[in-house]
């Protein structure tokens, strides 16, 4: 039966009943009585399959709506947790597994089912597509529907984990309890051992957040708007207290779990991949300084792993409280990520990147180059003598390159070509370093000027093709 289509199975059962009716005319034919029970089983199977097909179509219709509603949440990288396969469980994550595509810390592209439990919401946040006053298709998954959908997608190798968020229905605790039930059923009923990222609902109770951390690899609460006065302007029903309280619960849970596991080897882990958050860029008047100072404060907490920056998308153009943007500020978003990288991996302090006299990042050049051009007195740096911290501040030198420089110069002095082989971007670095065997034409930032170096490193404008020029296409 499994090898044929539903239509073929229906025809098969119809023909079988015709045969059975003919045989039943003979009351002495006892074999027909046993066939009758076989046919009953076939009918039950077909009806069950028919109901299952209807349910699947219904679930897929909900999935189309709720996946579309979830696409504006960017905080779905699943880096930072390891779950190895165990007997009796299904699935695993390897080295931080982050149907959306995300990237793990080692650069691998991974797949997550990124979906909302419901896009109904009691709040009317101006920046949100799912706000209460918007007229859009709405849907809600039951807990069992979402759990079964996740397992079906996982078995078919569509996904490697789940990223689950939700609109707020009734109250934060009611919504959070349903999110927890999804994760709990996946772990305990289906023995799912893949990656799970849950959004913690602002205002949810400590007990529910603590329970969520026992089943999820990562928890996140979105700050959204850095300044509370602007948050109140766009989302009057929210405040920062309701956001930072769950963050505190998550932090306490992670630290307590870490302490318990030092004493008891098999103590349960709590959100082993820590927590993350998201900030909307461009919806309000905050400067890059406001955003980065908030990020720096959040990174000061031991369990905050990532702050994500989401360029504001004009989804509610009718609301006059919002800026009229033709497209998201993607360049600004990219510069914030680069500055965030400097805070996390390059040992920069936030007031070195932005301050009162320089509140916004330069959109034409990256933040590291911008800092170097504002501090020419720090350069040139002797590659063969500078310490690791100073090497990290040289434009064109990354974390990996700096480590290789420190390791390689123990054996011999490094020159221009050795640095190029190591991976240093000499197009940038040449203006900020001295080393062995420099080409004669190379000049440092002090010999030229910061303005001259900036003009040399700015990308050249693309030449426009004259519309009157004849273009010949010779094919391949």
Q: Which functions belong to the PLM regions below?
A:
Residues 173, 226-235, 260-286, 305-330, ...:
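Flexible glycine/acidic-rich beta-alpha junction loops that bind and position SAM and/or redox cofactors
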Residues 205-214, 285-298:
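Catalytic cores of alpha/beta
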Residues 322-392, 428-452, 456-457, 471:
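Long, highly charged, low-complexity intrinsically disordered interaction regions
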Residues 24, 115-144:
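Canonical Radical SAM [4Fe-4S] cluster-binding loop centered on the CxxxCxxC motif
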Residues 1-16:
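Single conserved hydrophobic/aromatic residue that forms the stacking wall/gate
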Residues 131-146, 153-179, 185-206, 213-264, ...:
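Core AdoMet radical
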Residues 14, 24-120, 425, 433, ...:
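Flexible, acidic/Gly-rich N-terminal and inter-domain linker regions that tether
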